[in-house]
Amino acid sequence: MKRTISALFAFASLAILTACNPAEDHTLLVNMFIGTGGHGHTHPGAMVPHGMIQPGPDTRIHDWDACSGYYYEDDSINGFAHTRLSGTGCADFGDFLVMPTTGKQCVDYVGEKEKNQHNAFASAFTHENELATPGYYGVKLERYNIFAEITATCRAAIHRWTFPQSEDAGMILDLDYCIQDQTTYEMEVKVSGDTIRAYHRDNWWQYDHRLYFEGITSKPIQSYEIVRDTVLIGEDKTKVQPRCKLLVHFGPTNEAEEIFFKASISGVDAEGAHKNLMAEMPAWDFDGTQEKAHEIWKETLSKIDICAAEGDLNDLDSLQKSQATIFYTGLYHANLSPNVFQDVDGRYLGMDLKAHEGKTDDPYYTIFSLWDTHRALHPLMSIIDPAQNEAYIRSLIQKGEDGGLVPKWDCGSNYTGCMIGYHYASLLADMYTKGYRNYDVDLAYKHAVRSGEYDTLGITPACPSWLYPYIMPKARYYRQTQGYVPADLENESVAKALELCYNDWCVAQIAADRGDTLKANQFMNWSKLYTNYFDPSVGFMRGKLADGSWRTPFSPAHSNHRQDDYCEGNAYQWSWFVPHDVEGLIALYGGKEAFVQKLDGLFSASSKLEGEVVSADISGLIGQYAHGNEPSHHIIHFYNAVDMPWRTQELVDSVLNTLYFNAPDGLSGNEDCGQMSAWYILNSMGFYQPCPGRPVYSIGRPLFPRVIIHQPNGKDFTIIAKNNSRKAKYVRNMTLNGKALDKPYLTHEQLMAGGELVLEMSETK
């Protein structure tokens, strides 16, 4: 019996919607499109947790909202690339885009390429004919009347294309396609039977991005040609010039005929891509691969259960069910990155851009957005999967060994120099102080110290010297030699200095525990230098010039994106970045009363921003508190430090209910590799860690009647919110295992010991 394309889509939809009970299978609560609109920059592609390959739909090439390759408002698909980032504010990847076709294959751009979001072979699509669940993506390509589906393992993808009756079915492999039009300067392709091997090398955010590709078709290739723009350049070329595409022809197809295309990648060499494909996708088993991906996600999302007061998740009210969808979608996003970047044989491309032998049972990772993720993602993982954090630390240590310096933000084994601080120290200090040390502690500590002290020697020659001021900013030099970072000598001086202070404090915690008194004192003294940027006459942290005077003019609401004294923010947001010394910050303001008055002013100030080039990252505003970007994420919990927990509770409630939605534009800013989601997960459970490196959680306002955290040590920790409702946002009483808590804090040790945290909620503070 032949099935039409429409029937296939209906069948796939029914299978997904009726798969299981959401209380038993949390993948059914994942909305893959949350964050694909607005400026969330997520994507609905098919991945397994931390997958090295990220196959999915690509709908645009240019601009900020092309960062993941997909944007919900678009109505055309360029094809399906095999790599992408999730939620970032910088764009890269989009490697080896494929598109199944029928009829004549068009390859030229219409109009100017640099202004066109779509290629000549793009197909219209509708969201009504689009499906996505963890590990699966499917869509009807209107132009070709093809139902295209994708699923994946860690290193390999398999496409299933259901064709209509056609006289000329085929596919296009765009060897040059990449997000934001990187400059491709090396390219190879070779077809042998039904196997396609390709390679390209380009630069954009990554200064030297190299990737190998192997794909195999299930239907014999009848013919193929290679074109550059619209010019045929032959069949038997191996090395080709940029802007080349491979046009493959399968010949006729019957109605609902399925053609499969399986593919893999490697950062090392062609043999690596081949081994990855043979090891992880030996057969043409799309359904089996999808089921395995589903089971992996089902297990990953089962680490936390949300329940009604009486009953399970199915007994929640409609609002709470929608919030549960945001929660589990967030948990999904939190497990996408960092990504494995190592072949099945253990080899990986190091930060020196050389091949290294690694351990097959200890994957090497890339995509460390540490400026974002040190705040909530890694603290979350320390609770539900600390072994994953330890694996991250081992990879970061190896990056330091191979490249000479632990990166702030690495992408495909390239130093990007992106963002500020050295937040490897935060991740390390947090895990170290929580007792997790399954890594070489001596090496880990060595690289934390190395990251904090200004030194450009020993950095791999593979990293171009023009990147040195970004991966090893002079801010560290000025801090060491002058005690502050002059605003007229270093861009983003205040933000860089404040983050250095926090990172220095993190190193000091480890040094002190190890008995390294010299380094402990050195880094602790540096951690207190934040006081040099506080101007009591205005009550804000502000830029100080080399001659010791304050930079003028000054307005706390002013922003000049990445070209002022702050980083993606202004003085309103950055003046609170002293998470490691709240008591010291309170003293700067003149005591608790003045501190509270200033803190209240942050949330009551006008949200109007000043400047001609205001940072688009300043979003999700409550007053001048900007939840859409990371520097603000800890501030709400400062109220607990001044004995005003009710204020923390009502502000957490406000953010959870007004800045997160079950919709494509449901995030107030970039998702940032899981950070925005991790903030929601922790706070909706009822607590947050405002200072990673200090293993203490600040209690806020839980959203759900009952949450059970299934910890890897086998002990469950349950948070019960009695009398919980939309209006009952204040915590009247708190008990831990039956004993009253007199302060709104919980230690990591208490949490990991298991038990019950009972919060009695009230409508009045």
Which residues are covered by each model-predicted region?
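ATP-dependent phospho-/nucleotidyl transfer catalytic cores
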Residues: 503
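Accessory carbohydrate-recognition regions in carbohydrate-active enzymes
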Residues: 22-378, 382-426, 432-498, 506-517, ...
